[in-house]
Amino acid sequence: MSDNEEDYDIARSLTVNLEDSDSDSGSDFSDEEQEVQDIISSEDEAEEQPKKKQKTAKPAKEAFPSLELSGDEDEQDDDKDMASYFAANNPQAKKAKAGSFQSFGLSKLVLTNIAKKGYRQPTPIQRKTIPLIMANRDVVGMARTGSGKTAAFTLPVIEKLKGHSARVGIRAIILSPSRELALQTYKQVKEFSKGSDLRAIVLTGGDSLEDQFSSMVSNPDIVIATPGRFLHLQVEMQLDLKTVEYIVFDEADHLFEQGFAEQLNELLAVLPPQRQSLLFSATLPRSLVDFAKAGLSNPVLVRLDADSKISDQLQMAFFTTKKNEREANLLYVLQEVIKMPLGTAEQIKKLRLMDKRVNDEAEEEELENESGSKRKYKFKKERLPSANVLPSPHSTIVFVPTKHHVEYITTLLRDAGYLVSYIYGTLDQHARKNQLYQFRLGMTTVLVVTDVAARGIDIPVLANVVNYTLPGSSKIFIHRVGRTARAGNKGWAYSIVNEKELPYLLDLELFLGKKILLTAMQEQKCQLLKDKQGDNYVEPKVQYTDRLVLGSCPRLSLETFEELYENLLRNHYELSVIKEVAAKGEKLYYRTRKAASTESVKRAKEIMDTGTWDDQHLLFGPNLEKEKEKFLAKLANRHVKETVFEFNKKGNDRDEDSLVSFMHRRRKQLAPIQRRASERRDLLQREREAGLTHGIEDEILKAHGETGYSASGINDVDEEELQNAFEDADQLSSKSNKKNYRDDRFFISHYAPASVIQDQQLNITSSFANEAASATFDLDNDDKIGNGKQVMQWDRKKGKYINSQSTDKKFIIGESGAKIPATYRSGKFDEWKKKRNMQPAKVGSLETEGESKQRFKHKRNAAPKLPDKYRDDYHKQKKKVEKAVESGRDVKGYHKPGQRSEIKSTEDIRKARLLKEKKMAKNARPSRKRK
């Protein structure tokens, strides 16, 4: 490895960018496939032609313009272009500073709420998308997790809706893939619309249908929902969505991967055609491009951070592990690397007390649902810290593959003394909120989750992310580590990798464009620099943001944590039982995991053959045990090696033994093969040091569009393909197309295009419509992998085999012609209406005067009880009684002095006479005694 490897890569990348720009300017455009349409560009043309006039927009049906942000140095020019472009639509923007919230033409109410949230300047995605949404354009927004996509669509929607409409009907729908993300979006909508009379509700699975019926009848303006529950209510209540003005698909790629394709298609069929559609996602597979063309009208594509898939402030470290040492590595990372403090007795006691209170509240809620009464007292919760404050200095998320691993790792860490919360897909909603609340409050420092937490859980700032296992997809890895290093903050991502996961790490290397750095490579580079520079040598720093640094934890320290883990496993029977269950779930998980690429598997074998892939990690400094390891390596590589057949055989015994002679002949046969393999390894090592190695990963450094370290960005659709799909009207009118020597219709490269590998990694499923429901990236089914393998089962009642996977469910035909389970229209809403004797207003009609968004919880105005002199609250209760009497209520048994009249009423006199007659009749009986 040469000492100027880093500079060489930079020079190559610059050359690639120059070649890209030349090829882009001379690329061919097909008039038969696409139509000309406007584009808003954020390139350096603003500096060269500052007085260039804006061109009018030209409509197109199948393409949408591209809006990119190339870097921070171009943001000021982009802001000027955007401000001038939308000056006609936003008169207030002329006086405001370009690129600020005021320049978007937002109302004073919205700007005040933005200031209360602490936001001063919009993020790049907000700066680009908000003016477009305000201009009534359909937008496809694309930026990484944590870049402010939620506020990018909530602010303009609130601004355009302004206030509550007296006409009945939903005006805006926001669809989210998970309950957590829906609740997070609802929270932001309420905060940004504070002070207005806009009505917003949230509809998620797991909540009461009757409460959601009440919310829908209250005529909301904005509905934030998960697709499954919203479609359920739409079919059950037979909702008319003709008043919908805005539809937002948040985390759109995840909506399809999670199996919501049928629900989305059904909802699109009932939406009005004149709606404004917004689609936001962290990634944009080619399938979503097709969906955007079909479901959106003349959309604009906004792409940010096209050259970086993860935050440039994120530092990553990858720790190698042996087969049974993954738990010990996790304990070592938490204790020695992150410096995670153990929980004190007071903290553990406080945490248990809160769990007990929450359980009591859950039981009370169940009793309320059964009896209909309201509880008298609710425990007061502490206020959460602000969005830009860490819950704790060591707050860490640990990602595990399945639900069983969540239970196993949670039990292990709690036994080790850590304060742990946990979340998985099928966890009860009440328990999920409590666990997240404890972590947000800082009462727990570790949150163990499955991939369901990679999106949607509202944790604004996080210190560390730990991958207990490396995910099988580079896309999942991006969304995992996207939880930290947000909003300009630094963060660490630690991953534990075994030899079976090494090919996936090499896939990640190609996907991110960041090379793997081994300890031996760094030491060799330092030695070359030391020999070259002499006394002026300064050891280069390891860039954990630019390289994937791979190595192992210190062996001596790791053995200590291995002993700790063995002791915990021995002393806790429950932990050993959960471990067995997690091991079975892990087998099913690996069985359904997507296979790594063939090239990465080959490279992984080459790296493991070198024997240096599990050297001590550079994060822990020099290895003090290296001399000992070198000595052991010499013993392992000794020339005279004896097998068990030859051991302790000497002299004539050695010559006469048939097994000894057999091993001698075997060595002669293998000697040429071993010699050739050794020569090949030495040759590869010398070529690698001299920089002569030429593989697929090196081809990309000099040719555009080949496999290897690509700089095409987070989307799997490369730049050349996007330019062919979505034409640029300015380039067509101002530049003449140059002819290319190759015809794309017939040219076949001898290397696979870079888009093929990235398409495989971004598109977790091969088919958009048919295979979305059975996607391997199914975050909610983290405990159901591999279920339902047996198809035919014996039915004792029917006396024959039946299909166990078939059900007797009945279906109804939806608006789009697709079949929907008949349970969606079960008649519960009709029963609810009949019980309350009400009829919902017709969509489009005006609200009646009695309608209100408020729900009256208390209708009775009962008088207080009489005060008891022997109770502590006697005086307090006495004041309540006196106040009730003054207000005109009758308190039974209480009579104020002078309040009662001495004159009896006719009714009292009549009752007294009857009572007297009864007494006389009773007392006037003849005596039973004898006279």
Curated annotation (Swiss-Prot):
GO biological process: assembly of large subunit precursor of preribosome; maturation of 5.8S rRNA from tricistronic rRNA transcript (SSU-rRNA, 5.8S rRNA, LSU-rRNA); maturation of LSU-rRNA from tricistronic rRNA transcript (SSU-rRNA, 5.8S rRNA, LSU-rRNA)
Transmembrane segments: none
UniProt biased composition (Basic and acidic residues): 866-875, 882-910
Catalytic activity line of the entry: ATP + H2O = ADP + phosphate + H(+)
One CC-aspect GO term: preribosome, large subunit precursor
UniProt-listed Enzyme Commission number(s): 3.6.4.13
Sequence motif Q motif, location on chain: 99-127
Location (main, coarse): nucleus
CDD domains found in the cross-reference section: DEADc_DDX54, SF2_C_DEAD
Domain of life: Eukaryota
GO molecular function per UniProt: ATP binding; ATP hydrolysis activity; identical protein binding; RNA binding; RNA helicase activity
Compositionally biased tracts (Acidic residues): 19-47
InterPro entries: DBP10_C, DDX54/DBP10_DEAD-box_helicase, DEAD/DEAH_box_helicase_dom, DEAD_box_RNA_helicase, Helicase_ATP-bd, Helicase_C-like, P-loop_NTPase, RNA_helicase_DEAD_Q_motif
Keywords, comma-separated and alphabetical: ATP-binding, Helicase, Hydrolase, Nucleotide-binding, Nucleus, Ribosome biogenesis, RNA-binding, rRNA processing
Keyword Repeat: no
Binding sites annotated in the UniProt record for ATP: 143-150
Family statement drawn from the similarity comment of this UniProt entry: Belongs to the DEAD box helicase family. DDX54/DBP10 subfamily.
PANTHER family (alphabetical): ATP-DEPENDENT RNA HELICASE RHLE-RELATED (PTHR47959), RNA HELICASE (PTHR47959:SF8)
Domain notes from UniProt: The Q motif is unique to and characteristic of the DEAD box family of RNA helicases and controls ATP binding and hydrolysis.
Name of the protein: ATP-dependent RNA helicase DBP10
Taxonomic source organism: Scheffersomyces stipitis (strain ATCC 58785 / CBS 6054 / NBRC 10063 / NRRL Y-11545)
Lineage, top ranks: Eukaryota, Fungi, Dikarya, Ascomycota, Saccharomycotina
